[in-house]
Amino acid sequence: MKIFRDILTNAEVVXDNDKPMDVLDEIVYAXQGRYIE
């Protein structure tokens, strides 16, 4: 799993397969991410 930080809301989004689970209109607003177990 990977945590992305939303550059618009500054919220952390947990994702699988390097993609956030919640994608709006297939646009991903994520800057830096880090891996978690």
Swiss-Prot record:
One of its GO terms (cellular component) is cytoplasm. Residues 1-37 form the TCTP domain. The keyword Cytoplasm applies. It comes from the Eukaryota. Keywords: Calcium, Cytoplasm. It holds the Pfam family TCTP. The keyword Calcium applies. It is found in: Cytoplasm. Belongs to the TCTP family. Monomer. Binds calcium; exact function not known. This is Translationally-controlled tumor protein homolog.
